[in-house]
Amino acid sequence: TYLCCAVFGSAMVKRGQGAIVNIASIAGMRSNPLHAYAPAKAAVISLTAGLAAEWGRTGVRVNAVSPGYTRTRALQAAIDRGDRDPTDLMSQAAMGRLVEPHEVAVAVGFLLSPVASAITGANLPVDAGWLAGSTWQTYGGVPPIKG
């Protein structure tokens, strides 16, 4: 990620315009047992913010997308082998489902588009509400205060 940003970002800075979207993960936003993967994705999020600050006045925007559990071929194969329980994965998301690959692509396209011209340094979770849902589960699904 760093090398791609350095090479392509430098060219964009010279042109005075451009947009980069790095792919991170919700794993980089929360502590979890993925002791190599999670810190690497957290580094992508930090790199994104740092480059956005550094290049912000040059016309180059840098953002990230953090997918949640996405129905990729690899995840589907793990589900088919019985290595992953889709019910468990989906139960952790507020929306009760997996993310579809096209949903990640749409988020990337949005951040690259002129519609997002005022957005830089952002990390957009595309997680079907996994961050919200897993937080809710952490606290035992305590119902909200009424009144």
Question: Where are these predicted regions, by residue range?
Answer:
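C-terminal substrate-recognition "lid" of short-chain dehydrogenase/reductases
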Residues: 2-5, 9, 97-131
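Active-site helix of classical SDR
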Residues: 5, 40, 48
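Alpha-helical segment proximal to the catalytic Tyr-Lys
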Residues: 10, 53-57, 117
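A short hydrophobic alpha-helix cap/turn motif
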Residues: 13-14, 55-58, 70, 99, ...
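Residue(s) in the substrate-gating loop at a strand-loop-helix junction
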Residues: 25
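Active-site loop-to-helix junction immediately N-terminal to the catalytic Tyr of the SDR YXXXK motif
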Residues: 31-39, 50, 78
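Short, flexible catalytic-loop segment of classical short-chain dehydrogenase/reductase
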Residues: 67-77, 126, 132
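Catalytic Tyr-x(3-8)-Lys segment
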Residues: 83-103, 147
